[in-house]
A protein has these predicted regions:
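Phosphate/pyrophosphate-binding loops and the adjoining catalytic core of nucleotide-dependent enzymes
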Residues: 1-213
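ATP-binding glycine-rich loop module of kinase domains
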Residues: 37-40, 199, 206-246
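Short beta-strand micro-motifs within the conserved protein kinase catalytic domain, predominantly
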Residues: 264-275
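Activation segment signature within eukaryotic-like protein kinase domains
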Residues: 306-307
Length: 436
């Protein structure tokens, strides 16, 4: 698995100022403006070392004020968009002292970083097609000093410095980058002529999930569109949102062929350098909504019924040679008394080992959470299945210590046979795939 050079981290740590998360090239000076044309350089966790190595000489030569993350883990978190969607891709932030300096730095940084990869930065304007340089007019001191984010118009009126669509250039300013700026011809909501997205169900760095209407059939049907963005949340193994959606399409086709209740694929296509899956919309409800951690209704009988339905499905999946690696209640839908399974971006062949961990931390075996590879087997699914059963029986996640689980089993009256099955799943270390 590819890891970037740590040389750039050493150079960042030698920058004169740090707040623990960000390192700064120099202190803020009195003659530095409070607002202006802010530049951002985008990077993935794999391209960050090269982006920094090429950009730093340009910035140092111009004595530019800039900040960079102290750790790659911070960039990885920013690129996920989970905490703040507007921060995706913002590896280097530069605070030019004038419009002229902003134009010069944008031009030089674009040339210096040409050919490197980085995710598209939401709400910023892109300097040129395929450029890593983005810009927006905004407050500087909020980022440097933590003061409130407001900008002033020429007449003195204050406006909140919002990061939102169409807000990169305030309406009272001319865009000095307009000759090089990328023009968007995309019509909102329309992916293809016969697909109309009307609601974003989820939005993060690697892509979005949308409810849409498919106009290509009569009667028209509601569908789910899954988007994979190029360079979105690029992982240590080099896979980005685009690659994950393409991979999920392959997995879904194989699992449907094996008789698993996964969504049907209606269409797959690429547009604007992103990849899209048009999927069957699963009606019904998830076992547990994504924003809830524990079920409101619990009983060991309910846990047993879930196991009775879900365990044979996972056994069939494993017999087909696949491990899900993202088994959790929000990915399991109850539809007309039967279970339907969704979200297979992280699925892999049982014997594949060169992959980083995948899934929600509470459903990943503790021994696998900080590793950069996996051992062969179905242990991720086994552990997750044990966690789900425990949740619906006890109303909480299973304690790691066996004696604490035993106390909960006794206090809540868990049948011994079910208790043994759950503990066996939680302690699974080998593949349960049957050899034919």
């Amino acid at each position: 698995m590819r890891r970037p050079s740590l040389h750039w981290l050493a150079r960042i740590k030698h920058l004169p100022l740090s707040d623990g998360d960000w390192s700064y090239s120099r202190p803020h000076r009195e003659d530095d403006p409070a607002q202006g044309w802010k530049l951002h350089l985008s990077a993935t966790i794999l391209s960050a070392a090269d982006v920094f190595a090429r950009a730093e000489p340009v910035l140092r030569e111009n004595d530019a004020l800039f900040k960079a993350p102290c750790r790659l883990e911070l960039l990885k978190s920013l690129n996920s968009g989970l905490a703040d969607f507007s921060q995706i891709g913002k590896f280097l932030t530069i605070y030019p002292r004038s419009t002229e300096e902003a134009l010069r730095l944008a031009r030089e940084l674009h040339r210096a970083t040409r050919g490197l990869s980085g995710p598209r930065i939401p709400f910023d304007a892109r300097y040129r097609e395929k450029s890593l340089v983005y810009y927006r007019y905004g407050a500087f001191r909020r980022s440097v000093e933590g003061t409130p984010g407001f900008i002033r118009a020429p007449g003195g009126r204050r406006y909140r410095d919002k990061r939102a669509p169409g807000r990169a250039v305030p309406r009272w300013l001319e865009d000095p980058f307009r000759k090089s700026r990328v023009k968007s011809s995309k019509r909102p909501g329309l992916l293809l002529r016969d697909l109309l997205a009307f609601k974003a169900k989820a939005q993060r760095g690697k892509g979005g999930v949308y409810e849409a209407v498919d106009l290509s059939v009569l009667p028209v049907r509601r569908v789910i569109i899954k988007e994979g963005r190029r360079h979105g949340e690029t992982n240590w193994d080099g896979r980005d949102g685009y690659a994950l959606v393409r991979h999920e399409a392959q997995v879904l086709r194989k699992l449907r062929a094996a008789g698993l209740p996964v969504p049907e694929i209606f269409r797959e296509f690429a547009q604007n350098r992103n990849r899209y899956l048009v999927l069957e919309r699963i009606s019904g409800r998830p076992l547990l909504p994504a924003k809830r951690t524990q079920p409101s209704r619990i009983s060991w009988r309910l846990a047993e019924r879930i196991l009775e339905q879900l365990e044979p499905m996972l056994s069939r999946m494993h017999a087909a040679g696949w491990v899900w690696r993202d088994c959790k209640p929000s990915h399991i839908f109850l539809q007309g008394g039967t279970l339907r399974l969704i979200d297979f971006e992280g699925a892999c062949p049982i014997d594949q080992t060169r992959l980083p961990p995948w899934g929600s931390p509470d459903y990943i075996p503790p021994s696998s959470r900080r590793k950069f590879s996996r051992r062969a087997g179905t242990f991720e699914d086994d552990y997750a299945l044990g966690v789900i059963a425990f949740q619906f029986g006890a109303g909480k996640f299973p304690p790691a210590a066996a004696h604490r689980r035993a106390a909960l089993y006794r206090r809540t009256g868990c049948p011994e046979v079910l208790r043994e099955k759950i503990d066996r799943l939680l302690n699974s270390k080998i593949s349960r795939r049957r050899v034919k």
